[in-house]
Design a protein with these regions (language model features):
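Beta-strand cores of secreted/periplasmic/IMS beta-sandwich domains, seen most often
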Residues: 45, 69-95, 132-139
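N-terminal edge beta-strand
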Residues: 47-79
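Short beta-strand and strand-turn-strand segments in soluble, beta-rich domains
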Residues: 64, 111-119
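N-terminal export leaders
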Residues: 1-3
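Solvent-exposed coil/turn segments that connect beta secondary-structure elements
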Residues: 61, 79, 85-89, 97-101, ...
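N-terminal twin-arginine translocation
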Residues: 5-18
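Extracellular/periplasmic metallocenter environments
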Residues: 15-46, 118-167
Length: 167
């Protein structure tokens, strides 16, 4: 059908087939950019060095509504790889409005193919069994609240503290 349309615009049949084949190759891989935690975690961003790994679990298999750990300590200017997982049977959010304004998000990898988020990441939803890695640079010192805003999950609270680097 596309080749017929192209021939109506003056392309020969062989030119139309070649053009369609060339365009199809572009779209055979809908995810032309490959990203992996191995590549990003070791990549240097400006002077930040390799990512410092952190892990937070949202919820628990036992049904408890909690963040584990419930207190993260970061240093201003460092690149972090915050791995999150949700082993529970219900969805949970990692919501941190003020933290979103205090970090520079490099990338968020979630699933295959990875999803990339730009700008302020205020909410990250993890469905049951989901995992993701959030790469960011801690920028503004302070203590920031993290919560899961789902009704009934009020007990899920944590803090993230960004401190100035030691001189």
């Amino acid at each position: 059908m596309l080749t017929t349309s192209l021939t109506s615009f003056g392309f020969s049949s062989s030119e139309a087939l070649a053009l369609v084949s060339q365009e199809k190759k572009k779209y055979d891989n809908p995810w032309p950019y490959t990203a992996s935690t191995e590549k990003i975690g070791t990549k240097k961003f400006a002077t930040f060095g390799p990512a410092t790994p952190l892990t937070v679990t949202l919820g628990a298999k036992s049904g408890e509504f909690r963040f584990e750990p419930d207190n993260l300590k970061l240093t201003q200017g460092k690149l972090y790889a915050l791995a999150m997982d949700n082993p529970s049977d219900v969805p949970h959010y990692f919501t941190a409005l003020d933290l979103a304004r205090s970090v520079y998000t490099v990338v968020v990898l979630a699933g295959e193919p990875p999803a990339e988020f730009k700008g302020q990441v205020t909410d990250l939803e993890l469905k049951p069994g989901a995992q993701l890695v959030w790469y960011f640079v801690a920028m503004r010192p302070g203590t920031y609240d993290v919560r899961c805003p789902i009704k009934g999950h009020e007990a899920m609270a944590a803090t993230v503290t960004i401190s100035k680097p030691a001189l």
